[in-house]
A protein has these predicted regions:
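Acidic two-metal-ion nuclease catalytic site recognized across multiple nuclease folds
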Residues: 109, 113-144
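Conserved non-catalytic scaffold segment of RNase H-like nuclease domains
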Residues: 1-63, 77-99, 139
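Generic recognition of well-ordered alpha-helical segments
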Residues: 71, 87, 107, 111-114
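Conserved beta-strand -> loop -> alpha-helix junction used to position metal-binding or nucleic-acid-contacting
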Residues: 60-72
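Generic detector of well-ordered alpha-helical segments enriched in charged/polar residues
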Residues: 6, 69, 85, 128-132
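Ser/Thr-centric signal marking residues that sit
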Residues: 36, 68, 108
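Conserved catalytic/binding loops enriched for acidic/polar residues
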Residues: 104
Length: 144
C-alpha cells in the first residue's frame, strides 16, 4: 500500500495479511446486497471498481444506485462543494472519526436521510424521480 493511502485510511500491509481476497469477498457482498438499492457517496468510483471485477467473477451489480454527491447537487444546486465533509457541515452532521469504512458508511447514511426532506420539497419522492434528477447533474457525467 502507498504511504498516502495508509495516512488516510490507517490500513497497513500487515493488516491485510491473511485476509480474504476481493475474489472471495465480492461474491458474498453481491449476495448480501441483492434486491436492494445501493446508497453511497461519489459512488461512480466504487461502481467502476465493481464493474472491473464483474466479468472475472461472473457477477453483475445491476441494482439501482443512489449517490449522495448527486443528490446533494440536486437538493443544493447553488453550493460549490458536494464533498461528504461539505455536505455534513452544511446539514449539521457531526464529522466525528472519518476515513474508515464504517464511519464513512454511517456518515453517508446520515447525509442521505437528511437530504430526503430537501428532495421532497422539490417533488422528488420516489426512487425513479431521485435517479432521474441525479442523472441531470453535472457530476453524473464524471467517469472513472
Amino acid at each position: 500500500l502507498k504511504a498516502a493511502s495508509i495516512a488516510i485510511h490507517g490500513i497497513t500491509d500487515s493488516m491485510l495479511l491473511g485476509q480474504p481476497t476481493i475474489d472471495l469477498v465480492l461474491p458474498a457482498f453481491h449476495e448480501f446486497c441483492a434486491d436492494t438499492v445501493l446508497v453511497g457517496h461519489n459512488v461512480a468510483f466504487d461502481m467502476r471498481f465493481l464493474e472491473l471485477k464483474e466479468a472475472s467473477l461472473g457477477l453483475r451489480f445491476d441494482q439501482p444506485v443512489l449517490d449522495t454527491l448527486l443528490l446533494s447537487a440536486v437538493a443544493h444546486p447553488n453550493q460549490q462543494s458536494h464533498s461528504l465533509e461539505a455536505i455534513m457541515q452544511r446539514l449539521g452532521i457531526d464529522m466525528g472519526q472519518r476515513h474508515n469504512a464504517l464511519a464513512d458508511a454511517t456518515a453517508t447514511a446520515q447525509v442521505f436521510m437528511r437530504l430526503l426532506p430537501a428532495l421532497a420539497e422539490q417533488g422528488i419522492v420516489t426512487l425513479r424521480q431521485a435517479l432521474e434528477a441525479s442523472q441531470k447533474t453535472y457530476f453524473a457525467q464524471v467517469k472513472y
